[in-house]
């Protein structure tokens, strides 16, 4: 029997162990790569199924507990239980383990699909366009245009309602979400996709009873303000209650998001939601809620379903003033003096 030196024996054993481990690692890597590369296809199937989904025969209608004409907010126990439950559209916007997985999956899938190398090796014609809640119409048009290489005229065509379109307003009805389009999708076809989703998610659930109490245009406008002002789903209904309180009292809303809308509409500022300075409060515009009482003439952005529901079902709060601190905490008060005191506490100055 040949006696190998210990070092040679150890080396031989090491080689015997490394080879299968290396093969296993390569196989696992190939499988993992295949799974990841399948993300865009899986997302496309899911989105196409939703885009082709027929509207339910009797879709669940949005509840409404505010009455602008009577200037009342009457909270309903059953509605509160629904809105605060796990299946609520408001809770659907909260960051949970499940929602984080969904966001991560969508982000990875769209990032891969947008990569030129993926388009070349996959030989696919599909593209993804993601619209986030709180975007104004120009941002939505730019999102589609950057993916589909539209020119200025095509972008304008997309945001201009056709005679037979269901698009009810120039703002506020570009439903947030991820859309699956082909490289040949026209502005008219893209508008149809957006309109169909808005019909499915909002119009089909906005019953005549609800519309008789709060007209759709009014609800979308309030919801757009909530969407731009909220720090998350937890304060949506509180902000809604404060907005309605100020409307009931015929107070100016004094919402900075409307100043951002005015500022970006009339100046070249580099982004659609620029910071505001005190001088912006004097900008002449019907959208300036510091100068004019009541709601702006149209929504200022496209709200989520959660914000629309919050607009229809505000919290019955005595608060008139509110702000978010630097940590995202929400503070509301019934008097301006209390409001200023809290601002000094958290920001070192009043407002």
Regions found by a protein language model. Name each.
Residues 1-18:
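N-terminal Lys/Arg-rich, disordered targeting/topogenic segments
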Residues 39-206:
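Signal peptide-directed extracytoplasmic domains
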């Amino acid at each position: 029997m040949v006696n190998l030196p210990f070092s040679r024996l150890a080396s031989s054993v090491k080689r015997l162990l490394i080879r299968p481990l290396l093969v296993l690692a390569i196989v696992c890597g190939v499988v993992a790569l295949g799974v990841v590369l399948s993300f865009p296809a899986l997302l496309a199937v899911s989105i196409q199924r939703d885009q082709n989904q027929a509207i339910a025969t009797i879709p669940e209608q949005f509840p409404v507990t505010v009455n602008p004409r009577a200037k009342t907010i009457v909270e309903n126990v059953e509605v509160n239980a629904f809105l605060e439950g796990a299946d609520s559209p408001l809770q659907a916007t909260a960051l949970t383990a499940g929602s984080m997985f969904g966001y991560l999956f969508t982000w990875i899938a769209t990032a891969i699909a947008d990569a030129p190398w993926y388009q070349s090796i996959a030989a696919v014609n599909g593209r993804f366009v993601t619209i986030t809640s709180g975007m104004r119409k120009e941002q939505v048009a730019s999102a589609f245009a950057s993916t589909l290489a539209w020119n200025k005229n095509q972008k304008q065509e997309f945001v201009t309602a056709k005679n037979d379109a269901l698009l009810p307003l120039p703002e506020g009805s570009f439903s947030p979400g991820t859309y699956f389009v082909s490289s040949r999708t026209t502005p008219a076809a893209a508008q149809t996709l957006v309109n169909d989703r808005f019909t499915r998610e909002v119009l089909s659930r906005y019953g005549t009873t609800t519309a008789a109490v709060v007209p759709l245009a009014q609800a979308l406008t309030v919801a757009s303000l909530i969407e731009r002002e909220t720090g998350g789903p937890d304060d949506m209904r509180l902000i809604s209650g404060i907005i309605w309180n100020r409307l009931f009292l015929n107070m100016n809303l004094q919402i900075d998001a409307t100043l951002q809308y005015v500022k970006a509409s009339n100046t070249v500022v580099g982004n659609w939601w620029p910071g505001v300075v005190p001088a912006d409060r004097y900008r002449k515009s019907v959208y300036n809620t510091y100068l004019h009482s009541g709601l702006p003439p149209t929504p200022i952005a496209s709200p989520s379903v959660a914000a629309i529901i919050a607009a229809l079902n505000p919290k019955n709060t005595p608060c008139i003033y509110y702000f978010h601190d630097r940590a995202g905490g929400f503070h509301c008060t019934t008097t301006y003096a209390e409001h200023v005191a809290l601002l000094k506490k958290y920001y070192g100055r009043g407002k």
